[in-house]
C-alpha cells in the first residue's frame, strides 16, 4: 500500500524543480563558495518585504518561533524553514510507522524525497493561505482577492527557493544542510544585533541604545554615578542587558562541554586481522533533532490556535487552546493563562515562576518530556537505531570486539536508546535553563546555534583530515 502511494504521487513529483547531483567531486573551496552564495541569497530574501501587504505591525503570535524557524516577519522569509521541517517530520513519521513503505534502492529514496518536497509545497500553500486569511497583513476584504493571491504566490516562490537552496547543499555542492545553516545564521544574527545594536529606544529612564555592549559604554559615559550605571547595564529591564549576554556565553560553554560526552565501543574488522577502530555513541546522539521537532510542533499549534481564535472568537473550547491578545507597540502576541499555548511557551524570566509556578512546572515537564520522546522516536524512523547500526557495521564487515555478530544488536541496545532518550532530556533541560537565566535568542535558539556550529566544526575537521592542512583547505 505504501509503495502504491509513492507511485501515485510520482507524476506530481516530476513537475517540481530538482538540483542534479554533481558529476565530479566538489573541492572544499567550491563548497565554501556555494555555501556563502546560498547564505547570501537567504539573507537578501530576509530583507525584501512582501509586496501588497497593508500592515505587519499587529501583534505577532509567532514571535518566539521566528528565531528558531529562520523566518522574518513581513518579508519573503515569512515562513522560513517551517514547511520543510514540517513535511520532513510528517514523512519520516509515516515511513517509520510503516504507513508508507520506502525501499533502500536509489529510485525509492528519490521518490520519497520528491514526495517530501511536494508535501512541503502543499504545506506552504496552506500556511500562506492561513496567514493571509487571518489578517496578518491586513483585512483580506480591504486588500482584495488579487493582492491576497499575489502575497500567497510570493510566499510560495520564496519557500521553493529555500527548498532548492537546502537541496543544493545536501546534494554535495556545499557544506552541511540549508536548514541548519539558515537556523544558525538567524540565531547568531539575533545575538549579535541585541549585543551591538546602535538603535535607540526611548524609555522612562531616557534614550538608551538597544545593544547591551553599546549601552554599557553609553551609560558609563552619560551617568555620573558609575556604580549605578554598571548596575543598570547588567540588569536593565525590557532591553538586552549584560546579564543576558553573560547567560548566552555560559550556555554556549555548557553545550560545547556536553558535546564531548560519548562512549566509544571497540570494533574490529571481520576480514583483516589487527584492524581495530571504535564506534562513538554521543550523549547528544540525535543532535538537535528533538528541539527542532518540538519547535515545529509548537509552531504548528500556534498557527492553528491563532487561526481558530480569529475565526471563532469567544468560543469556550477554542479559548482553551489559546486566547490571544495584542501587546502594545506591536510586541509579541500572548495568550491568557487559561489557554494551552500559554503553558507551552517559556516564562518571561526565572522570577516569573514564583508568580505562576504552575506555568513553570508545566513548561519544564513539556520540554523535557517532548524532547526525550522525539529523540527516542527519531532513532527508529531515521535509521539510527541499534538494529540499523548493527546492519551498517555488518555491511562494512566490522564486528564488536568480544561479541559475536548476532549479539551486537543486544550490546548496542544497551547504549543507543539510553543515549537517545537521556540526550533528548539533557537538550530539553539545557533549553529550559537558558530560558530561565535569560539567554539572548531563547534557550531553544541557543542550543540549535551551538549544535549546528559544532556540526560545521566537525565538517571542517573532516575536510582537513581528507585534504591535509587548513592552509590547503582555504588556499
From Swiss-Prot:
Transmembrane segments: 33-53, 76-96, 118-138, 145-165, 173-193, 241-261, 289-309, 354-374, 420-440, 441-461
Organism: Halocynthia roretzi (Sea squirt)
UniProt function note: Component of SEC61 channel-forming translocon complex that mediates transport of signal peptide-containing precursor polypeptides across the endoplasmic reticulum (ER). Forms a ribosome receptor and a gated pore in the ER membrane, both functions required for cotranslational translocation of nascent polypeptides. May cooperate with auxiliary protein SEC62, SEC63 and HSPA5/BiP to enable post-translational transport of small presecretory proteins.
UniProt record, GO biological process: pronephric nephron development; protein transport
Complexes and interactors: The SEC61 channel-forming translocon complex consists of channel-forming core components SEC61A1, SEC61B and SEC61G and different auxiliary components such as SEC62 and SEC63. The SEC61 channel associates with the multi-pass translocon (MPT) complex.
Protein name (Swiss-Prot/TrEMBL): Protein transport protein Sec61 subunit alpha
Pfam families: Plug_translocon, SecY
Localization terms from the record: Endoplasmic reticulum membrane
Amino acid at each position: 500500500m505504501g509503495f502504491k502511494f509513492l507511485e501515485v504521487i510520482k507524476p506530481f513529483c516530476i513537475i517540481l524543480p530538482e538540483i542534479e547531483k554533481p558529476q565530479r567531486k566538489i573541492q572544499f573551496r567550491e563548497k565554501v563558495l556555494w555555501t556563502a552564495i546560498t547564505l547570501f541569497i537567504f539573507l537578501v530574501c530576509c530583507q525584501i518585504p512582501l509586496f501588497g501587504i497593508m500592515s505587519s505591525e499587529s501583534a505577532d503570535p509567532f514571535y518566539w518561533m521566528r528565531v528558531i524557524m529562520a523566518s522574518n516577519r513581513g518579508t519573503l522569509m515569512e515562513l522560513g524553514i517551517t514547511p520543510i521541517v514540517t513535511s520532513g517530520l510528517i514523512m519520516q513519521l509515516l515511513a517509520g510507522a510503516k504507513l508508507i513503505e520506502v525501499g533502500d534502492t536509489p529510485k525509492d529514496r528519490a521518490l520519497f524525497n520528491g514526495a517530501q518536497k511536494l508535501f512541503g509545497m502543499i504545506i506552504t500553500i496552506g500556511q500562506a493561505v492561513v496567514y493571509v486569511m487571518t489578517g496578518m497583513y491586513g483585512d483580506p476584504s480591504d486588500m482584495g482577492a488579487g493582492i491576497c493571491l499575489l502575497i500567497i504566490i510570493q510566499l510560495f516562490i520564496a519557500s521553493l527557493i529555500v527548498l532548492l537552496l537546502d537541496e543544493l547543499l545536501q546534494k554535495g555542492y556545499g557544506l552541511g544542510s540549508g536548514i541548519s545553516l539558515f537556523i544558525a545564521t538567524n540565531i547568531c544574527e539575533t545575538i549579535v544585533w541585541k549585543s551591538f545594536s546602535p538603535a535607540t529606544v526611548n524609555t522612562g529612564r531616557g534614550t538608551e541604545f538597544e545593544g547591551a555592549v553599546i549601552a554599557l559604554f553609553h551609560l558609563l559615559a552619560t551617568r555620573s554615578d558609575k556604580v549605578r550605571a554598571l548596575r543598570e547595564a547588567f540588569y536593565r529591564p525590557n532591553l538586552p542587558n549584560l546579564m543576558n549576554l553573560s547567560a548566552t556565553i555560559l550556555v554556549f560553554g555548557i553545550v560545547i562541554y556536553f558535546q564531548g560526552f560519548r562512549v566509544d565501543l571497540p570494533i574490529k574488522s571481520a576480514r583483516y586481522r589487527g584492524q581495530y577502530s571504535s564506534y562513538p555513541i554521543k550523549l547528544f546522539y540525535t543532535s538537535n533533532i528533538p528541539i527542532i521537532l518540538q519547535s515545529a510542533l509548537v509552531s504548528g499549534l500556534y498557527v492553528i490556535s491563532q487561526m481558530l481564535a480569529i475565526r471563532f472568537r469567544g468560543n469556550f473550547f477554542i479559548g482553551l487552546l489559546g486566547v490571544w491578545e495584542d501587546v502594545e507597540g506591536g510586541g509579541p502576541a500572548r495568550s491568557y493563562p487559561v489557554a494551552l499555548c500559554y503553558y507551552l511557551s517559556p516564562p518571561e524570566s526565572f522570577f516569573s515562576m514564583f508568580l505562576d509556578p504552575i506555568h513553570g512546572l508545566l513548561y519544564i515537564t513539556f520540554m523535557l518530556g517532548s524532547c526525550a520522546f522525539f529523540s527516542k522516536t527519531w532513532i527508529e524512523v531515521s535509521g539510527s537505531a541499534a538494529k540499523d547500526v548493527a546492519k551498517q557495521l555488518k555491511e562494512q564487515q566490522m564486528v564488536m570486539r568480544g561479541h559475536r555478530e548476532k549479539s551486537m544488536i543486544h550490546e548496542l541496545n544497551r547504549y543507543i536508546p539510553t543515549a537517545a532518550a537521556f540526550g533528548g532530556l539533557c537538550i530539553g533541560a539545557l533549553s529550559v535553563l537558558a530560558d530561565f537565566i535569560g539567554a539572548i535568542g531563547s534557550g531553544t535558539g541557543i542550543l540549535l546555534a551551538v549544535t549546528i556550529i559544532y556540526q560545521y566544526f566537525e565538517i571542517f575537521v573532516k575536510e582537513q583530515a581528507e585534504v591535509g592542512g587548513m592552509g590547503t583547505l582555504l588556499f
